[in-house]
Amino acid sequence: MNYKDTLNLPKTDFPMKAKLPSREPEFLQEWESNNLYQRVQQKRSGKPKYILHDGPPYANGNIHMGHALNKVLKDIVVKFKTMQGYDSPYVPGWDTHGLPIEHQITKTEKVDRKSMSDVEFRKKCHDYAMKYVEIQKEEFKRLGVRGDWDNPYLTLSPEFEAEQVKLFGEMAQKGYIYKGLKPVYWCTDCETALAEAEVEYHDKRSPSIYVGFHVKDSKGEFNEEGVEFIIWTTTPWTIPANMAIALHPEFQYSLIKSGEKHYIVATDLLETVAEEAKLGEYQIIREYTGRELEGIVCQHPLFDSRESLVILGDHVTLEQGTGCVHTAPGHGHEDYEVAQKYDLEVLSPLNDSGVFTEEAGQFQGLYYDKANKEITQALDKRGALLSLSFITHQYPCCWRCKESVIFRATEQWFASVDGFRQDALKAIEDVDWIPAWGEERIKAMVMNRGDWCISRQRVWGVPLPIFYCQECGHELITEESISAVAELFRQEGSDAWFEKEAPEILPQGIQCSCGAKKFSKETDIMDVWFDSGSTHRGVCAQRQELAWPVDLYLEGSDQYRGWFQSSLLTAVATKGESPYRECLTNGWVVDGEGKKMSKSQGNVIAPQDITNQYGADILRLWVASSEFKQDVRVSQKILKQTAEAYRKIRNTARFILGNLYDFTPEKDYVSFDQLEEIDSYILCRLQKVIDQATRAYDEFEFHEFYHLIHNFCVVELSQFYLDVIKDRIYTMPTESRERRAAQTTMYYLLDSLVKMLAPVLTFTSEEIWQYLPGDREESIQLTDWPEVNEELVDNELEQKWANFLEFRKEVAKALENARKDKKIGSSLESKILIYADEDLFKKLQSFEDNLEELFIVSQVELKKAEQLTETVKNQALSSEDVEQASIIIEAAQGEKCPRCWNYHPEVTKAEELCPRCSHVLETSNK
C-alpha cells in the first residue's frame, strides 16, 4: 500500500521560485489600478499624523544606488508608521531648477544658448527637467516605494514658486536680505556664483611659491636695510589682488639675516621656511610679536604704485606657510573679513570668465590659471620670487562641470545669517539628531558659516523678485512688490518675469522713496538651495494632508551643509523654529571593498541592474540589512548573500502555507489554552520578536530587525519548531486537536511575520498575504502592525524551553557526530539514552512524553547518571559526555514504520505499521 496518500503532506500554489523581476511589476500594476495609495490614506484619515518630508532629488539622469538606499529607507519608515495607525502620507518631490540642467542643455544637448531668448532656453530646461522627473518617478516606483506619484511637488510649479517668493519677501522685510561686494565661490566655466554645497574637492597640481614683500616703511621697528616679509601661496594668480600681509597678534616672529638680506618669518616655522624657500644659512637678529609689527608698509611685489599693509588676524595659523599670510580681500573669505577692519579695498581684477581685467595691469587678458606662469616669472624678474615648486593638493571644483572654482568678489545678494544665527543654534538643540553627532556637526557649520550668497547669474531658476529705481538705483523690495510677483508666478509661473517688463509686473502707482516711478528688474535668479530650502513652506505648510513642522527629514550625510541647513535657515528666519523635529542621515553607498563607486573604476552597480537580476525586494532587504547610518557596501557577493537570506525567509513562509492548505481560521482555530506546550512556547517567543521588531523600527535600527527576523525564521522556526512538528502535522488525523493546534500556531506565526516584513519585503509580503487563508484586508498595506498579546507571554515557560534548547544542541551534536562516523543515517534510526544528573533529570522529566518528537529520533530513555555503566558505553554506537549528562546513541529498536518512518519495537517486518499509525488509520477516513 502507498501510505503517502494517508499523510497530510504540504501542498500550496505559492511558488518556490520568487521570479521577482517579472512578478513585481504585476503587483505595481495591481496596486495602481486599485488606487492603493489613496485607499491607505482614506483608511488612516483623521488619525494622528506622522510626516516624513521628502528631500527632493535633482531631476537629472537616472537614479543611482544612493537614491535607492534613501528612497527605500523612507518607504520603510512611512509603511511602518502607517501600519502603526498613523496618517502618514508620502509626497515625493523633485528639485528642478539650476545649473546642472543648464549645463546638460548647453554641453550635452549642444544647444546654442546665445541663439535663443531666455524664455526659449528656459522652455528647454523645463522640458529636460520634466523628462527626468518622469524617468526617475518610474524608477522609484519600481523599487516598491508607495507615494502620491500622481501629485508630486516640483520646485518649478507655479504654486511652489509663489510661496518661495513670499518666503524671500518675509526674510527681506525682516532685514535679512542685502546686496554686497564679497568673495564667493565662482565657477568661471559656468560663469556663476556657487554655494558651498555645490563645491567638490579633487586633486590638483599647483605651483607652491615663497615671495618676499620688501619693507617700505618699518614705522621705526628696525633700521636694517632690505627687510622682506615672506609669504607662501599656491595661487600666484591672486598676488595682483594683494592688499595686505596678515600676522597673528600673539605669535612670535623672527627677523633673520640670510646673506645680504633680512627676512621676517614666524619663529616656529623658521626651519621649514629656510629649507623650502632656499634661504641657506641664517642668523636670528631679534624677535617680535605680531602685534609689534602691525602697520608696517611693504612694497607690492608686482606694482610700483601699490603698497601692502601689515595687519593682524586671528585666522593666521602655524600649520603651514610662513605665519605671514598673503591677503587678497577680493579672493578669500577670511581675507575679506580681516580687510574690513582695516578698510582695505576689495580688489578682484577678473571678469566673469576668469580673465584678468585692466586692474591687473600687464596681466590683462590672461585667464587666471594660465597667468600663474606669467606672474611667477614677473616675480622672479623683480627679485621677489624666493622659490618655486609644485604640490598636489585638494582643490575646490564645480559640482557640475568639474572645473576648478575660485573665490571672487562680486556684487551678490546675501541672506544675513548673523541676523538669526543664535536662533538657528537654539533651534538645532530642539531637534533630535540621528546619529547624535549630527547635532555638533551642523552646529559647527551654522556657527562658523558666513552669510548665504543667494544670487546666481543664470536664468533657469526662480528670479530674485527685486526691482531697481532707474533714477537713483535704489532697490525695491516691499510687501506690495513681493505680493505682486508672487501672485503673478502663481498664475503664470516664473517665465512671466522674463516675458514682461517691470511696469507690467508692479502694481500701478508704486514709486521709489526718491519719488521716481520707473523700475528695472533684477537679472539674477535664486540659489537652488533656496528653492529646496523653501519646501517646508511651499509644500508642507500648503498641502492639506501634510503639516508644519514635520516629524522627519531623512537624507544623506552630505545634507548637513545642504538641505538640512538651508531648510533650517529659511524656517528659523521666518518662523523662529526648525521645520523638522527629527533628522536622520544615511551614509554613502560604496563597493564591496569600501571604495567610492565610479565609472572609471568599473565598480558601479545601478539599482536597475539589481531589480532586473534579483528583484526590488532583494534590494530592499539589502537596505534593511545595512547599518545605513554608516557607509553601506554593495557588491555581487553581498547581493547573493542577501538573496540567500531572502530565500530562507521565503521558504519558511512557503512551508507554513503548504501546511495550511486545509485550514480555515474561522472554523479550525484552536484556542490558546488548548495548544501543545511547544506551540505556546513558540508563540511566546513570537511576542518577544514583535516587541523587539517594533523597537527596532521605531529607532530606525532596521539592520537589527533584519537579523532578528532572519534568525527567528531560520533558527527558531525552520531548524526547530517547524522541523519538530512535521511528525504531528503529517501523521496525526486531519481534524485532530494536535494537528489543528499546530496549524493554528503556524497561522498566527505567519500572519504576524508577514506584517512585520511588509515595510521591507513589500512585494513578497503581498504575495504571501494573498495565499494566507481566512478573511482579510485586500492588501497587506491596509493592515495594522501586530501588537504583543500579553496572554501569550510566559517568561517562566520561555526560560524552561531556553534551558531545554541548550541541551538539545548537545544532543544534535552527538547525533551529527554519529552521522559523520557513519554509525547512523537519519536521526530516526537512533535511540538516545540520556544519563542525567539530578538537576537536569528533573528538568527533562517534564518533557519526557515528547522527547522523541523534540529530538526527532525514534526512541528516548531518560535515566539517572548513576545508572550509566561502562558496558552500556561500550555497546553504544556513539557516546558523548556533556555538562550534567552523558548522551548514549544506540540503534533504534524494531523496524521502520512505512508511514511515519519512526522505528518501533512492535514493528517486526516490512509494511507493518507502528501502533500509532495503525490507530490513526483505523479512526480516520484515510
Swiss-Prot record:
Listed InterPro entries: aa-tRNA-synth_I_CS, aa-tRNA-synth_Ia, Anticodon_Ile_BEm, Ile-tRNA-ligase, Ile-tRNA-ligase_type1, Ile-tRNA_ligase, M/V/L/I-tRNA-synth_anticd-bd, Rossmann-like_a/b/a_fold
Motif ('HIGH' region): 57-67
Pfam family, one: Anticodon_1
EC number: 6.1.1.5
Cofactor binding summary note: Binds 1 zinc ion per subunit.
Domain of life per record: Bacteria
Major location category of this protein: cytoplasm
Subcellular location: Cytoplasm
Binding locations of ATP: K599
Alphabetical GO biological process terms: isoleucyl-tRNA aminoacylation
Amino acids binding Zn(2+): C897, C900, C914, C917
GO CC aspect terms: cytosol
GO molecular function: aminoacyl-tRNA deacylase activity; ATP binding; isoleucine-tRNA ligase activity; tRNA binding; zinc ion binding
Listed HAMAP family: Ile_tRNA_synth_type1 (MF_02002)
Self-association state and partner proteins as the record states: Monomer.
Protein family: Belongs to the class-I aminoacyl-tRNA synthetase family. IleS type 1 subfamily.
Name the record gives this protein: Isoleucine--tRNA ligase
Source species of the chain: Natranaerobius thermophilus (strain ATCC BAA-1301 / DSM 18059 / JW/NM-WN-LF)
Encoding gene, per UniProt annotation: ileS
